[in-house]
A protein has these predicted regions:
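Acidic glycine-/aspartate-rich tracts in secreted/extracellular proteins
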Residues: 6-10, 23-28, 49-51, 103-105, ...
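Intrinsically disordered, low-complexity segments enriched in small residues
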Residues: 44-136, 142-146, 163-177, 181-184
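Aromatic-rich beta-strand edge motifs centered on tyrosine
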Residues: 84, 98, 149-151, 169-171, ...
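Short active-site oxyanion
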Residues: 175, 204-208
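Secreted, disulfide-rich extracellular signaling modules
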Residues: 1-51
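A short, surface-exposed interaction/processing loop segment used at functional sites
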Residues: 153-164, 209-212
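Beta-turn initiation residues at beta-strand->coil junctions
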Residues: 141-142, 179-183, 190, 199, ...
Length: 215
């Protein structure tokens, strides 16, 4: 496997839009014939992560609309995320806020009966997907960003996120928890279904509870 993230970024502004694979040692001359009619055709697989929402490690062009909210356009894929703050309370221990989000990557979906592309920060979901023959979990946060979790080799009940946010997912007997690096815990119901080749995604379950590090 090769990480071509930086190379792919250069494709946007550069003239070269390809990948060259070369041996570490080369001879002065080399000749080899490959027939176009061979049964084993070469192929190149490019994997990319969903960049559908708002994340601190991505770059956006922000535009305020006053009390209506703020629009953010991703400089990576042109996706529009519009955030409208509904309410916010400091609280004695754990602050609470609710925000409406419109995500143009979800413009064809009305999952929560709020209009196409809309959700609130409380509509956080979890489901399973079948990817390269392995089952992974996908956590969708309040603005629509998808975070993928792969199973740990040393602990079959724990999964680590692939977005670099240091999130840990653990499958328990009664529920599933996601813990961040500050020891805040999100609790979800068990995802009982298993994805298959014919149905590679399971139904989504909604978050049940959020608990801070001190309980």
């Amino acid at each position: 496997e090769f990480d071509v993230t930086n190379l792919a970024r250069k494709w946007y502004l550069g003239d070269n839009h390809g990948v060259q694979l070369s041996a570490p040692k080369s001879e002065s001359s080399f000749s080899q014939l490959h027939s176009s009619e061979t049964a084993n055709q070469p192929y190149f697989v490019l994997e990319y992560a969903s960049l559908a929402g708002l994340e601190s490690y991505l770059t956006y062009d922000h535009q305020s609309a006053g009390l209506a909210g703020t629009g953010s356009v991703s400089l990576v894929n042109g996706n529009l995320i519009f955030a409208h703050a509904d309410t916010a309370m400091n609280g004695n221990r754990l602050p609470v806020s609710i925000t409406h989000y419109y995500n143009s990557c979800d413009s064809d979906k009305d999952e929560f009966g709020m209009g196409y592309g809309w959700r609130t920060s409380l509509h956080q979901t979890l489901h399973k997907v079948l990817y390269n023959g392995e089952v992974e979990f996908v956590y969708t946060d309040g603005d629509g960003t998808e975070h993928f979790f792969k199973k740990n080799e040393d602990d079959q009940k724990k999964y680590s996120d692939q977005s670099g946010l240091s999130l840990t997912l653990e499958v328990g007997d009664e529920n599933i928890t996601i813990t961040d690096k500050g020891d805040n815990v999100m609790t979800f119901p068990l995802v009982s279904d298993t994805p298959t080749e014919d149905a590679p995604e399971t139904a989504k379950v909604l978050i049940q509870k959020i608990q801070d590090a001190v309980g």
